[in-house]
Amino acid sequence: MAKKVGLACDICGARDYTTMKKEDVSIRLELKKFCRRCNAHTIHKEAK
């Protein structure tokens, strides 16, 4: 079953996005998304 995880901006730390992730995957998710605080496309990493 999948669980909901938050994505935090790598630069400023803002948590703008949530997504679903399978529980059996141990690698932390990294996606390039738009950050409203930085006003740019940045890497967003899975937050704890």
UniProtKB/Swiss-Prot annotation:
One of its GO terms (biological process) is translation. Belongs to the bacterial ribosomal protein bL33 family. It comes from the Bacteria. InterPro entries: Ribosomal_bL33, Ribosomal_bL33_CS, Ribosomal_bL33_sf, Ribosomal_zn-bd. Transmembrane segments: none annotated. HAMAP family: Ribosomal_bL33 (MF_00294). NCBIfam families: PRK00504.1, rpmG_bact. Keywords: Ribonucleoprotein, Ribosomal protein. The gene is rpmG1. It comes from Exiguobacterium sibiricum (strain DSM 17290 / CCUG 55495 / CIP 109462 / JCM 13490 / 255-15). GO terms for molecular function: structural constituent of ribosome. The keyword Methyltransferase does not apply. GO terms for cellular component: cytoplasm; ribonucleoprotein complex; ribosome. This is Large ribosomal subunit protein bL33A.
